[in-house]
Amino acid sequence: MDSQGRKVVVCDNGTGFVKCGYAGSNFPEHIFPALVGRPIIRSTAKVGNIEIKDLMVGDEASELRSMLEVNYPMENGIVRNWDDMKHLWDYTFGPEKLNINSRDCKILLTEPPMNPTKNREKIIEVMFETYQFTGVYIAIQAVLTLYAQGLLTGVVVDSGDGVTHICPVYEGFSLPHLTRRLDIAGRDITRYLIKLLLLRGYAFNHSADFETVRMMKENLCYVGYNIEQEQKLALETTVLVESYTLPDGRVIKVGGERFEAPEALFQPHLINVEGVGVAELLFNTIQAADIDTRAEFYKHIVLSGGSTMYPGLPSRLERELKQLYLERVLKGDVDKLSKFKIRIEDPPRRKHMVFLGGAVLADIMKDKDNFWLTREEYQEKGVRVLEKLGVTVR
């Protein structure tokens, strides 16, 4: 709470999950799927102890997703369906989750890098007009990740459910001209795993199965350090084969798919996406930065988001970066490679790094009035109030 006893809320709206809670906390109060569902056919009024309503949100919608038509209001980190987004916020602030009176609270929201201005204007409008928060702040996710790590300068590789961003931050400011986006993230890897399992003869086709495969992915998948070696092991031995029990009790065996699915992050062509993979994109981003800042960036690469949780990802990233640096910068001169310093930070709580950084920032700033966009300022200036955040509003 701030000095006037008002709650300070932090809400990280991801494509796949909402993480929300309070300033100063070490963990989100609630984490739930960012989805809205409507019944396909209205037959039974109850399933187990969950009542089927015309509109189901979050956890409830996730549990009954086989009976619902589900929509994710956000796509690739950007709001696409504002009506459903409002339902999601109603659920977040309402009795089901935070149970707050938004008129007496401040809120810190997060946004992806390169968020369109129109999107940001609409968020501000909804927060002040619909929910009437006393103060609002919108922070860029990559900057919050670095705050959570105690840094002001570094490159954030943020890979969530809907989008992967590579975002350099210098002295606490994100550098939009250097920010790169890769439209491959958790959801695409889950889809690819479904396809690979289909080739093995296991059919998963329903949206309820999607959740099952997502959990399987989180439990079994890893990133191969040396892909040729992994493929050899998968072909010639059974060391990679793991059994996995599905919710209905069936047991399936998963082998090479365990590393083949996340490989899409490094080789986008596997899922028919044009462009370079995450390692080369990271290399290109740092090399495009000012020459004086490159060494700092290479030493402060911070992983963030659920799709960076695969075992083996940090070491593979480091290996590929060194290889690219050797080929393209040192022109193959191995002796000079020892001077090339690189450090990839993979904090254990990186799944919720953005929320943690937001909770730190909101706590430090809770009583600094000039930090927040206030309701009075909004009533006076409308969306032009965003200029206070250093955003040019047309």
Swiss-Prot record:
Its lineage opens with: Eukaryota, Metazoa, Chordata, Craniata, Vertebrata
Gene Ontology terms: biological process: Arp2/3 complex-mediated actin nucleation; positive regulation of double-strand break repair via homologous recombination; positive regulation of transcription by RNA polymerase II; primitive erythrocyte differentiation
Pfam families reported in the protein's UniProt record = Actin
InterPro entries from the UniProt entry: Actin, Actin/actin-like_CS, ATPase_NBD
The record's comment on protein family reads: Belongs to the actin family. ARP2 subfamily.
**Domain of life of the native organism:** Eukaryota
- What keyword terms does UniProt attach to this protein? Actin-binding, ATP-binding, Cell projection, Cytoplasm, Cytoskeleton, Nucleotide-binding, Nucleus
Name of the featured protein: Actin-related protein 2-B
Function, please? ATP-binding component of the Arp2/3 complex, a multiprotein complex that mediates actin polymerization upon stimulation by nucleation-promoting factor (NPF). The Arp2/3 complex mediates the formation of branched actin networks in the cytoplasm, providing the force for cell motility. Seems to contact the pointed end of the daughter actin filament. In addition to its role in the cytoplasmic cytoskeleton, the Arp2/3 complex also promotes actin polymerization in the nucleus, thereby regulating gene transcription and repair of damaged DNA.
